[in-house]
Amino acid sequence: MQVTVETKEGLERVLTITVPAANIEDAVSAELRNIAKNRRFDGFRKGKVPMKMVAKMYGQAVRNDVMGEVMQRHFIEAIVKEKINPAGAPTFTPVEFAEGKDLVFTASFEVYPEVALQGLDKVVVEKPQVEVKDEDVAEMLETLRKQQSTWADADIAAEDGTRATINFVGSIDGEEFEGGKAENFPLEMGQGRMIPGFEDGIKGKKAGEELTIDVNFPEEYHAENLKGKAAQFAIKVVKVESRELPELNDEFVAKFGAEGGVEGLKAEVRKNMERELAQAVKNKIKEQAINGLVEQNNIDVPSALIDQEVQVLRQQAVQRFGGNADTAPELPRELFEEQAKRRVVVGLLLGEVIKSEELKADDEKVKALINEMASAYEDPTEVVAYYEGNEQMMNNMRNVALEEQAVEAILAKAQVSEKAFGFNELMNQQPA
């Protein structure tokens, strides 16, 4: 076997492989003998059919099958010999293939990039310094009360915190437009659900009042035909309701299954908030470390890996919406391409951190991660036992632990400082 390697643009490589004719003919002859021996032919006893007849009937099909098998096998031998690491399946192209002649074919594919980590000392990370304060717990209890609240008719004007039930008809240039009409539409004031100016027109109005407002749809509005358009809405206020909050007492506490009355609920709420806060702090640190790693290391990415990741994201999107990945229409690639590329880049860079630091999943960290995750469930011991009895789940947690260890390795070389945050400030931040 002869092999030549051609480096194309970026990560693309082309192998030209020559396989001696004798190898091909031997493989074809062996397969034809196997057919003659095991297949029945009319007019002949099993195994007694003339080889010329078998070759005439099956020769071309066998030769094609042999060619595919030979190309695959010799490609693997070639990449082992040349110490090449393909990032995806190759595309085979026969160049010369005729009976009695050497087989010459090309294999085109991409390789993994060679990653030489740099700039870890330039990665900047601000470590959040934050705690759950009494006022944070009080605010969370108020949120729980609002979730359990009821609405009651009131002879009041609509304002933030009230709920106005309205009828409305929207028009543009005097013509009603699709989706611009509703009856008995409940609108909780102050939530910003409507386009700018809509709620402002309703504020101060009572049940039975009618009004007309002029507004503009934002340029970034989701409906293409309404972006930036000036519109007019005729509105009737059907009723205005005030929110009635339940008292913070034992009856309220019982709805959440907490023990120890109001103080017990406060303690449970604080515990949950502290657990969520710890995870948010960890995520914030990890996000900054990985962002810095990506910014400092610009690498080529094999398109084959991006293709694979796009497909994974497509399937996850379909499953999130309760669909079947086999029957759902294929979602556009552009919805996922940027995220897919980012995930591939992060995976390659973290893989290099793990390799260069010679990291292995720490058993104690794996246990700690499982216990931390299990603490959010009613019976943590049952969850821990489930993980420990499921090798696939354990492997998933080992990968999580290994990723955390890689982040720790980045932080050890990064510029890390501390920054004070409030609870809500940190919890409401969106990932960069």
Swiss-Prot record:
Pfam families: FKBP_C, Trigger_C, Trigger_N
One of the record's GO cellular component terms: cytoplasm
Keywords: Cell cycle, Cell division, Chaperone, Cytoplasm, Isomerase, Rotamase
Catalytic activity as recorded in UniProt: [protein]-peptidylproline (omega=180) = [protein]-peptidylproline (omega=0)
Catalytic class of the enzyme: isomerase
Keyword Cell cycle: yes
Sample GO molecular function, one term: ribosome binding
Record GO biological process: 'de novo' cotranslational protein folding; cell division; chaperone-mediated protein folding; protein transport; protein unfolding
InterPro entries with a match to the protein in the record: PPIase_dom_sf, PPIase_FKBP_dom, Trig_fac, Trigger_fac_C, Trigger_fac_C_sf, Trigger_fac_ribosome-bd_bac, Trigger_fac_ribosome-bd_sf, Trigger_fact/SurA_dom_sf
The enzyme's E.C. designation: 5.2.1.8
Ranges where the PPIase FKBP-type domain occurs: 161-246
Cysteine pairings via disulfide bonds: none
Localization, UniProt: Cytoplasm
Top-rank lineage group of the source organism: Bacteria
Family: Belongs to the FKBP-type PPIase family. Tig subfamily.
Record text about domains: Consists of 3 domains; the N-terminus binds the ribosome, the middle domain has PPIase activity, while the C-terminus has intrinsic chaperone activity on its own.
Family annotation (NCBIfam families): tig (TIGR00115)
Function comment: Involved in protein export. Acts as a chaperone by maintaining the newly synthesized protein in an open conformation. Functions as a peptidyl-prolyl cis-trans isomerase.
Stated name of the protein: Trigger factor
Gene symbol of the encoding locus: tig
